[in-house]
Amino acid sequence: MKVFAGFILGIVVIIGGITAYVFSGIYNVSAMVPHWSITFNILEEARDQSISYHSKGIVAPSLKDPKMEDAGFHHFQDTCRLCHGAPGIASSEFAQGLYPKPPDLASPDLHREMNNSKIFWIIKNGLKMTGMPSFGVTHSDQDIWDIVAFIDRLSALQPDQYKAIVKEANQRDEQHNESEEKAGHGHGTHHQHGGLPGSS
């Protein structure tokens, strides 16, 4: 009986201590202060297990399609590059203050750890308290698979190759916009899927 009472008392003390700590405001939520190692490891493991569990059953389509890669490149430029950077291009200034730091999507290590189904799930659903939004709110599944198709190719690109893709895409955009203006439409779009350089 004394053992049981001691156990209950211990639980009450632990709960009371946690409650007091939470409401004290002592814990520093600043993004400039990293998590304790044990906290980081627990959160990282919970994240990885959650992604693995919830991405089960997602079957990736064939991603070796130049049109998918081209569409994915434009989405990547619009929505991913600022936080994640690109080959030879650093992330934007504001992204460097994010915690945890957004991963380098061109890293071979990331592609060894994450299959395309997991990457699709992350892009679609986002990750709580990381700065990673859910693009499933604003993008179709096809749009997201297009992004995955480009990310799948990203690790093989050298900085000069990425710059060449950006340059060619900008030239196509300008040509298309000029054609639209001459035709009297007065508006253009940059999502013209002619295929990326070297993607065939």
Question: What positions do the PLM features span?
Answer:
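Short, solvent-exposed mixed-charge patches
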Residues: P197-S200
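Extracytoplasmic electron-transfer domains, predominantly the class I c-type cytochrome c fold
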Residues: G97-R153
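Histidine- and aromatic-enriched segments that form or immediately flank copper-ligand environments
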Residues: I89-A95
